[in-house]
Amino acid sequence: MELKDQIKEENEQIAQRKLKLKKRREEGQAYPNDFKRDSLAADLHAVYDQFDSGALTAKAIRVKMAGRMMTRRIMGKASFAHIQDMKGRMQIYVTRDSLPQGVYSDFKSWDLGDIVGIEGELFKTKTEELSVKVDQIRLLTKALRPMPDKFHGLHDQEQRFRQRYLDLIVNESSRHLFQTRSQVIAQIRRFLDDRGYIEVETPMMHPLPGGAAARPFETHHNAMNMDLFLRIAPELYLKRLVVGGFEKVYEINRNFRNEGISTRHNPEFTMLEFYQAYATYEDMMMLTESMIRHLAEKIFGVMEIKYQGVRIDLNKPFPRLSLRDAILQFNPGITPDQIDHLETARELAHKYEIATPAHYGLGKIQTELFEKLVEEKLQQPIFITHFPKEVSPLSRANEENDFITDRFEFYVGGREIANGFSELNDPEDQAARFREQLKARNAGDLEAMSFDEDYITALEYGLPPTAGEGIGIDRLVMLFTDNASIRDVILFPLLRSK
């Protein structure tokens, strides 16, 4: 069927459904709000699928259910249909003789997509499918738009994102994905709560952008006549709380970055950040390894997952490799001399078509080389450690080598999942790093951080030795659900206007 014919047919169906709704309005029963259900499909299947027909009939179990009518087969005086609720589907058996006069005729005029409430008794069909023999049924909500037909479905990716509500109705895989996402977040909370962390909320609007290298979204508070920035990270506020005595804190919330959109970047995304006093980046790596295994075991019951065709073993200890050594190990043709000196590193970057503005130092160039030449090769879980100080303005410098920091990033499936480090708690060193960031900003680096004087003041009151970490929830869900694009795991990703 051509598109124009599909549109014409859909418009005709909408018109017919509106006429049916008009009739119900005239009867005073368009949108009833007094139906109370007592059962969900999946719960009933879990308990009663195991019963044989005779045992189930003997129990005479009555249920009240509600859901969207997804299928229907009308066979004269009897019909089978499936209704779908938040947990699954249940078959219902509706007959003219089991309902009050006129109700069955009314039922036959309803449409797929309508939301109905039913009461009846559980039984098994000849094919042993758990079903409800209905003796009361009501139309609760009239659907004015038809569902996608069973042959064409809803496969257009952009339409799925724009009309996520429709995607969730017709695609069981989408419902399962976002249920899994909810489980991931719930298990993260349980994991941290059980270890004595306190969940907190910090501001979404900041007077200064900070806590990460990224371009912010700008806004304005009219009543206070004040320019503000949507937060790019909660880090500086969370560390203020550690100064205040909240020694183990975490936050799960949204971050906003005014940057490009890709399969791994959405301008609005969910981040877990957590901080612990009297801990180091080594402790954070051990905690991360435990958390990943906890999620795999509690949600999926496995220690091996498959991501984009690659089997990923979560049971083995996660190796650790410095950023410098990773460049060399994954690129045998590159020598230490090429990456240990500014000019040779710049030449190497140019060879791989990596832009290196004049204000880039050796540390920044090494990081760019790593991202271009190594990142996608990191399929199995690994911690990349000791990032250069130049790209780590909030990290504690390594005591043996001032060029690098006690920082790591966790990679799996060719993507960065987490970033953590021992925190810089020297206010004078932090102020100097902020000044270097200002120089970079003045040289054209739009992602460089601002100088946050109040944060320096907080450090001057004393931040205990602390380590912290941020984990991208969206990327973590991508990993566990085997999705290649971040938009697949965000309910309402940002899209261009039509």
From Swiss-Prot:
Q: What's the protein name?
A: Lysine--tRNA ligase
**What compartments host this protein?**
Cytoplasm
E.C. designation(s)? 6.1.1.6
Question: For Mg(2+) 2, which residues are the binding ones?
Answer: E416
Give the enzyme class.
ligase
What PROSITE patterns does the entry give? AA_TRNA_LIGASE_II (PS50862)
Per the UniProt entry, what are the Gene Ontology biological process annotations, in alphabetical order?
Answer: lysyl-tRNA aminoacylation
Q: Which residues bind Mg(2+) 1?
A: E409, E416
Co-factor binding details: Binds 3 Mg(2+) ions per subunit.
Q: Which family does it belong to?
A: Belongs to the class-II aminoacyl-tRNA synthetase family.
Q: Name one GO molecular function term.
A: ATP binding
Source organism superkingdom: Bacteria
